Structures are given as structure tokens and as C-alpha cells.
Amino acid sequence: MNNIEATLFLCFFCIFSSSNVHFAGAKQTAGNITPSENPFTPKASLIRYWNNHINGDSPKPSFFLSKASPLTAVDSTRFASLASNHALNTHHSDFCSAAKLFCFPELAAHSLEKHGDDVNFAAYSGKNFTNYGSDRLSGADSFKNYSGGDNIAVDSFRRYSRNSAGHDDGFTNYAGEVNVADQSFTTYATGTTGGSGEFTNYNTDANEPNGRFTSYSDKANGRSQTFTTYSENGNTGYQSFTSYSKNGNGAPNEFSGYGTGSNVVNTGFTKYGESANGANDSFTSYGENGNVPVNEFKGYGDGGNGAVYGFKNYRDQSNIGVDSFSSYAKNSNNEKVNFVNYGKSFNLGSDNFTGYGQDNVGGNVSFKTYGQGQSFKVYTKDGVVFARYSNNVSSNGKTVNKWVEEGKFFREAMLKEGTLMQMPDIKDKMPKRTFLPRNIVKNLPFSSSTIGEIWRVFGAGENSSMAGIISSAVSECERPASHGETKRCVGSAEDMIDFATSVLGRGVVVRTTENVVGSKKKVVIGKVNGINGGDVTRAVSCHQSLYPYLLYYCHSVPRVRVYETDLLDPKSLEKINHGVAICHIDTSAWSPSHGAFLALGSGPGQIEVCHWIFENDMTWNIID
């Protein structure tokens, strides 16, 4: 035992020898500490906190205790001291590793070494590509099954194919089915002549796909870029294109099947095609069948000459969605922009065209069969044609709810023994993390006013994916509570206990669905038990937020019914899972565009809506 450990042990011994604390007993199943377990670990501290703040009759569930920090007592004290002195960033890698946090892996430093030969990467991941294909004459580089299926895929491409001639790049099945993707393309194909870049099945079926294309194909001459099935079926995430094809000459770009079937994926195009000559860009089936796709075009095609931009089936058949076109094709010469089947959403979206085609000389803009909800401000009055404006958008029928997974929402009447129903995907898609000890959390910044400090602590560079993830979580936590809602974001198990007991009292129990068996399959409802006698009751529901450490968004739900039920295999009728479902009785404050109403029909306040508690989410209730 070194001097630090000895000092800590004596300090802890003095504190606890004078307090009424018992460390004897059985293993975690009994909610006590084993004789061999250090009584000063974060987990041991959590068990004592539970004993002191929750009535003794309430069971200590293993799934909750398992989320305690794995830090040793010494490390917990050391990192707490660093946090209180604003020096935790100096031990970022050590902290991430010891506390089992979600941190992006550190890529090898950028190298100035040139790679002049053709490369063929298959089943490869975690690479920093610098100067690949630079100054190349012809040849091709191929990336197949790159970063596929990874939990966290972080790749950086810098100066790739820069100043090359006739050089082709192909990305096939790139970062598909990953959990969190962070892909960076900086000065990619800048100053190239000819050649092509092709992205096929890029970030397909990814959770939280994030990509940044900066100065991509800047000053390129005749180089084509194709994005096919890009971020298809992706979940959340942000894709940014900055100065893409800027100052290019005759460089066609094609987006086909971009973001199709995705859920809340944001895309930003800034200075895309600015001052380009003879650009030819087409967006086909862009954001089609998506749920709330958000796209921003800022300074797109500004100052261009002779460009042709085509949008076909753009955001067609999607749910809601938000598009913003600012200074699009402004100050351009002879540019043509065609929108066909634009924004025919099932639920009214929001589209703003500001400074659209303004001062465009000799060009024309046409809208054919475009949806309701568009706003056109300061656009050129000459050369803009509007045809077949459509406002017969309907939110009825199966076509509307195809993006809402079957079984995600259901009616209370389904919770009857013998009912055959579809189970949604209840698997936790987020990276595995743990809570931080409270003595560390209380010393960490967590507000929009200190966002820069948070980025520094967790090594998140400005405009990086991690910076966006952190900002999004903080913003959601600071969002004002809905009418009748009490909410709090918690980063320690003790904080969650405090919030739950402040709403429900000390006699509480916490539940979650037992496992993920039956997920995405048909199941039969077995024995059903209504919590609190099946009466309308109160609950505190806690849902994970993506953040470096385990962060939960907890909120009070005042009028619900909560059920436990056995889930049976449809063929053998054997028990395969024990599910927890919550039914919201009062939905009057919900948005009319909520996925529950698209899936079930009806609207706010007209029906109750039920859903399962997914893996690693939980609900707190008053103990029976």
C-alpha cells in the first residue's frame, strides 16, 4: 500500500468507524457488500446511499447497481480532485479508460508521408489517412467493408487525392451498421482533374452517423462525386458539407438515396458549389421516407456560372422535415434549378427559401408538384415557375407510419394474456458506459454557458462529432419542461435516486425489461400484473442520453398505468422475457405529429399510448 492509498484508507476508516454503516452480508443479489469487496468503491457507496434513502422493503436490482462506476476508491478520489481543480483534461485518456466512458479513440498523428500506389482496403477500420493519392496520375483506391459493424468508428481523411489527375476513389459498405460514426474528410480531392469519387452504402443502418466534408473537391476540374445509399436508415447524426465543390469547373455531383428512411438526420451544406462553373448536381430520393429530416443549404451555388441543380423526390413521403435554403443560387449567372415532387410530406414540414435565385442572371427556377408549408422570401421574380402546388397532404394510412417501427407504440387493450403482438427493437444502441461517482459529477461543468469547458474536459474539438453530441445532450437537458412535466438530467446514480424520491417518496421500486429476447419478433403476452393495482398512478421514467458518461434524462409522468408481463415464445409458449410497459393515459400535451399517432391513428388527448421500457431505460414507481 503506497502513501496515498494509506492516507485515503485512514481517512475513510475514520469517517465510517463513527457512523452506523454495516458492510457484512451476501453478494449483490442481496444488495449488500461481499466480505472481499472494498467498502470504499463507488458501487459500495451507492449501496449505502440506497440503504439510507430508500425504504428497506424495496429490492436493490442488479441492473441498477451494475451501472455504478468501476473506478477504484483511489482513482475516484484522484479524478475528483483533478475535476475540482479544472485539470481533468490533462488525464483525458486515463480517465476515459478507467471510468469506462464513451470517448473517441485517438487516431495516430497525421503524417506527411505520401502514399503513391493504388490501395485496396477491405475489412479495415480506425485509420488516419493523410496524403493518400496526392498528386497521383490515374489509378484507383478502394475501401470495402471499412469500419463495418464497429461500435465506434472514427476515421480521418486529410489531403486525400489532392491535386491528382484521373484518380478514382471508391468507398463501398463504409462504416455501415456502426453504433457511433465520426468520419472526417478535409481538403479531399482538392485541385483534382478528372477522376471520380464514389460512396456506396455509406453509413447505412448506422446509429448516430456523423460526417464532415470540408473543402471537398475544392477547385476540382471535371471530377464527379457520387453518393448512393448514403446514411440510409441512419438514426440521428449530422452530416456537414462545407465549401464542397467550391470554385469547381464542370464537376457533377450526384446524391441518390441519401438519407432514405433515416430518423432525424441533419445535413448542412455551406458554400456548396460557390463560384463554381458548369456544375451539375442532382439530388434524387434525398431524405425520402425519412422521419423529421433536417437540411440546410446556405450560400449554395452562390456566384456560380451555368450550373444545373436538380431535386427529384426530395423529402418525398417523409414525416414533417425542415429545409432551409439561404442565398441559394444568389448572384449567379444562367443557373437552372428544378424541384420535382419537393417536400410532399405526410405531415406538414417547414421550408424556408430566403434570397433564393436573387440576382440570378439568365437562369430559371422551377417547382413542380411541391408540398405545403413552403415560405419564399426575397426570391427573384423573373424566371421562377411554380406548378401543381399540392396541399392534400394526408396523415392517414399505412404509408404514413412505415417509418414508425411496428410494435413501438400500442394500445392498452393489447396487454391481455394470450395476445400475439410484434415486439419492437428494444436493444440498447448506445455505447456501453457507467455513471460517474457523484464527487466527480458535481465538479464537472454541465451547461450551455460552459460548453467550451465541457469540450476541453472530454477532448472534443470544435465542430467535431463529439462536440455536437455533447452540445445536443446539454441543450436537451436545458429544454424547458413540458406542461405538467418535472424533469432532470442525472449523471450519477445518487442523483437519480434523489430525483425519483423527490417525486414519489422514499418507498419506490425501479424496473426495466428483463432482457432483449424476443426483440423485433412476435411474442405472446403471458401473465400480466398491473403495478399499484393497475390504477392510474405516477412514475418517473429515465431514458439514456448520448454523452461521454452515463447520462439519463428523467422526467415525472403523472398519469400512467404501469404493467409487468411475461413474454412467451409464440410456438412453445415458454417464457422468454419479462417486460415492463408504461401506458400514458393523458396525451393531450403531445404533438399531433408524434410517432404514436402516426402509428395508431387519432391525436393528442384522444387515446392512451403504451410502449415498452427498452434495455437500460427504467421506470420508478411507488412500491406496492
Swiss-Prot record:
Keyword Secreted attached: yes
Please list the tissues where expression of this protein has been recorded.
Expressed in flowers and stems.
* Phenotype caused by lack of the gene: No visible phenotype. Atpgl1, atpgl2 and atpgl3 triple mutants produce smaller leaves and petioles.
- Which positions does the entry assign to FXXY repeats? 121-124, 129-132, 143-146, 157-160, 171-174, 185-188, 199-202, 213-216, 227-230, 241-244, 255-258, 269-272, 283-286, 297-300, 311-314, 325-328, 339-342, 353-356, 367-370, 376-379, 386-389
Q: Which residues cross the membrane?
A: none
Entry's InterPro entries?
A: BURP_dom, PG-associated_BURP
The text the record gives for the protein's domains is:
The BURP domain located at the C-terminus has not been identified in non-plant proteins.
Please name the PANTHER family in this protein's record.
POLYGALACTURONASE 1 BETA-LIKE PROTEIN 2
Record-given protein name: Polygalacturonase 1 beta-like protein 2
Source organism per UniProt = Arabidopsis thaliana
